[in-house]
């Protein structure tokens, strides 16, 4: 079972400036939702952003320790904009 802190640390190991919030959707530690804010996402498409995150998670995906991840990937500027819009 993957802990929230382990998931955050895995993501931050590849996206060192990332601010990460995670939520276990099922209580089983294998279905997660994440909001990830990183300057590394600048100029990248949604698919490219998700690929960066999946690179960080290869080890737990390969072992099925992580089965599903829903994510929102934002640059710091996009995050600030979403806060000001109340979303």
Language model: regions and residue ranges:
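Solvent-exposed beta-strand sheet faces enriched in polar/charged residues
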Residues: 23, 35-37, 72-74
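C-terminal structural segments of small proteins and small subunits
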Residues: 55-87
